[in-house]
Amino acid sequence: LARSIITLTTDFGSADHLAGTMKGVILSINSDAEIADITHHVLPYDLLDGALAIGQAYKYFPAKTIHVVVVDPGVGTERRPLLVSAGTHYFVAPDNGVLSMVYEREEQLTVRHITSDHYFLQPLSTTFHGRDIFSPVAAWLSKTWQTNAFGEEITDFVRFTLPKPKPAGKGVKGVVLRADNFGNLLTNLAAEDLPQVIAGTSFKMRVGNVEISKFAQTFSEGGPNEPVLLMGSSGFFEVAVNRGNAAKVVSANRGTEVTVEFA
C-alpha cells in the first residue's frame, strides 16, 4: 500500500518547535505518513507569500497528496478551517485566501468548512491551530479519505487574485510579487504576456529606477551587478543578477512597478 504523503507549508521558521510539533501530531495518528516540508519560511503573516509558495509547489507532488498550509494571522478568531479537494490534491488550511493560487489553477474544487471537532486535539488552543486542527485533520484524512466526514461544503470561501499585467504604451506594465532567498525578483509577467521577449525582440524594462535590456537563458549570463530578465522555473519572468542580489541592485521588492516597452 502506498504511503500517504502530507506536506507542510508555514511561516513558523525553523528556530522554534512548532513545525516539529505538527509532525509529531500527524505521526501519532498515522505513523505510516510520509511528511515533506515545502517551506517553513513563508514571510510572517504574509498570505500572498504563502499562496505563491504552495501554488508553485503542489503540482510536483503525487496525486492524493495532502497539503497542510498554516499562514494564519487570524488564528483563534471566527475564520474557518477548510478542507479543500482540488484536482487530485487535498489541502487543509485557514479560510483567509492562502489557497488563492490553487483556486485559480484548479477547475475541480470542493471546499468544506471543517466542523467535526472530534478530529481536533483537545483542549483546543486559540493560538496553535496548526497543531490542534490542521495537522490532526490531515492525518485522519490520510487514513480514511472520507472528506465529507469533516464538514459541509461551502462556496463563500475567501480568495484573492494576483495583480494582472496591464497594457502600457507600446508594452506591458506589471509588478514584483516577491524577492526570493537569492534576491531574484519574481514578477507577475508570464510567457503569454511577453511573447516578443522570448522571440528575441529588443526591449527596455524598467524596474524602479533601473533599465534592463538583456534577456538571459541562465543566471550566469549577466556581468557583475548586471540585472537581466529571464524566464523563471515558475513560468513567470524574473529579474536576476549573476551571483548577486537583484533586489538590492535595483532597489526593488514586492509592489515595485515593472514596465516593458518595445521599440
Spans of model-derived segments:
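Anionic-ligand-binding alpha/beta catalytic cores of soluble enzymes and soluble regulatory domains
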Residues: 121-188, 193-198
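N-terminal beta-loop-helix "entrance" segment that forms/cooperates
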Residues: 37-57
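Structural motif
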Residues: 4-7, 33-36, 65-68, 81-83, ...
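N-terminal glycine-rich anion-binding loop in soluble enzyme alpha/beta folds
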Residues: 3-41
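Conserved active-site and cofactor/substrate-binding residues in soluble primary-metabolism enzymes
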Residues: 17, 21, 30, 45, ...
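Active-site histidine-anchored catalytic micro-motif
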Residues: 4-5, 17, 29, 35, ...
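A conserved acidic, glycine/proline-rich C-terminal tail/linker
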Residues: 186-251
